[in-house]
């Protein structure tokens, strides 16, 4: 559906520096500040001109799209993971590399905790890498509209176990996490170019539990 118009444009502050990163802030106009139409946008983007254009801006703009579409706060893994998925491959490869480091050094986050996180944890970087990888895995399994419908049900019901069962066929978040771990262990392959179809790939991974 078409996104609602904003009350005012979003001002963007640009700072050129070697490290690519950004920040976008806004408020919701609902009674508790967690729901409603977003407003009072502020965006800051940092990095080289190339990285700002191909990674930082797409990431920060994606935050505004998700806020405008769902009109509520999102779990941190979902918001940052989905927004990281639109970055340049040079940035997403860093996430994939960092993920392996985090998972092999005891910094991975259990899904039953991660899916409920509405605020950033003290150790933020694993959330970004793991969130990106989980979003990419789900997008490999089905279409973007399917993913959006999955998110909508999870937000409405607060039952992510039920949402992941309905939309992706996993028994619960634990089942998803074990299967995702197997996928990561196989190198996070693109399923559209895998030697077996998507319908064969996930059942094979689950049989390895």
Show where each model-derived region lies.
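Post-HExxH zinc-binding segment in Zn-dependent metallohydrolases
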Residues: 69, 73-118, 167, 171-183
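Juxtacatalytic substrate-recognition/specificity segment
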Residues: 1-75, 92, 108, 117, ...
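Beta/coil-rich, acidic/histidine-enriched accessory regions frequently appended to metallopeptidases
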Residues: 109-112, 122-126, 156-209
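Sec-exported extracytoplasmic/periplasmic mature domains
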Residues: 1-2, 62-71, 87-92, 104, ...
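Short, solvent-exposed loop/turn and secondary-structure capping segments
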Residues: 24-27, 95-98, 150, 193-195
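Stable alpha-helical elements in mature extracytoplasmic
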Residues: 53, 57-61, 78-82, 95, ...
